[in-house]
Amino acid sequence: MRVVFFGTPEFALPSLQILLQPQSPFEVVGLVCQPDRPQGRGQKVLPPPTKVLAQAHGIPVWQPVRLRRDPQVLAALEALAADVFVVVAYGQILPLTVLQMPKLGCVNVHGSLLPAYRGAAPIQWAIANGETETGVTTMLMDEGMDTGAILLQAKLPIGPEQTSLELAPQLAQLGAELLVETLLKLEKGELTPIPQDGSRATYAPLLKKQDFHLDWQRPAQALHNQIRAFSPNCFTGIEGQRIKIVRSASPQLHSPPPEIPQGSPGEVVGLARGEGIYVATGEGSLLIRRAQLPGKKEQSAWDLVNGGQLKVGMRFEPLPNS
């Protein structure tokens, strides 16, 4: 089976790797990914991980800025005469001309149980909303945003303290395994695509800065879900400076001892020896385990207590213009 792979970030790597295994029944004849972009603190221009892997296997790579407006890439894709296009976190919408090229269509691996969490950030929003289960879906793509007919699905539990950074590799691997099963069954005509029920659709939009701002008036459980969903980016203010809250403990598993007062939202109301600090919220208290001060490395909240940067009675507050 001749495959063109569309995918850019780490999430796409397991799917590409599984197609490239020795004795694989799949022949990857091309890769399409996003252009090389500046990354990290140093803003060094780096290639996408899928490009590095493809080039190591001698696979031709295309990196159009706008696929639908690049006639040379479109012509090259047509000439490859692929049986199927596989799309995993590519980062651009495929135009109808591309969707219609391969004989078996375009198969997408999406990191949710569609029609739930259509969009760019399904893993993060599933955690932020307190889901206890998610999964991956393979679908036949159409022109909509994650609206294509469902081929196969596989479920995965979400742990009460699991972060999106921990969940993503598990979903990526599960998606790779589901992709192989999907392609083999699709080639044999053993799959019946099931249209999505649009009335049950939910959405997972691109993340924005305001999604990372912690509002201590919210319940402890909601804040915990936000922190682990968007880690390590959530932030708040303390004594006029920004502090990132990187890791918290599940309020269901770590309730404060009875001697710790309730306090007002944002107030540091107690210490958990060797672990961190308890912060009052709009409903209950939240144990903060790891944090990061400006210009410093991430460290345990208990180390910040020992260093005098965090104390009982201090208050986390909104930052101006945050």
UniProtKB/Swiss-Prot annotation:
Lineage: superkingdom: Bacteria
Pfam families, per database record: Formyl_trans_C, Formyl_trans_N
InterPro entries: Fmt, Formyl_trans_C, Formyl_transf_N, Formyl_transf_N_sf, Formyl_transferase-like_C_sf, GART_AS, Met-tRNA-FMT_C, Met-tRNA-FMT_N
GO molecular function, one term: methionyl-tRNA formyltransferase activity
Catalytic activity line of the entry: L-methionyl-tRNA(fMet) + (6R)-10-formyltetrahydrofolate = N-formyl-L-methionyl-tRNA(fMet) + (6S)-5,6,7,8-tetrahydrofolate + H(+)
A cellular-component GO term for this protein: cytosol
Its EC number(s): 2.1.2.9
List of residues binding (6S)-5,6,7,8-tetrahydrofolate: S112, L113, L114, P115
Keyword terms, alphabetized: Protein biosynthesis, Transferase
PANTHER family cross-referenced by the UniProt entry: METHIONYL-TRNA FORMYLTRANSFERASE, METHIONYL-TRNA FORMYLTRANSFERASE, MITOCHONDRIAL
Entry similarity comment: Belongs to the Fmt family.
Function: Attaches a formyl group to the free amino group of methionyl-tRNA(fMet). The formyl group appears to play a dual role in the initiator identity of N-formylmethionyl-tRNA by promoting its recognition by IF2 and preventing the misappropriation of this tRNA by the elongation apparatus.
Protein name, entry field: Methionyl-tRNA formyltransferase
Naturally occurring in which organism (per UniProt): Synechococcus sp. (strain JA-2-3B'a(2-13))
Gene (name only): fmt
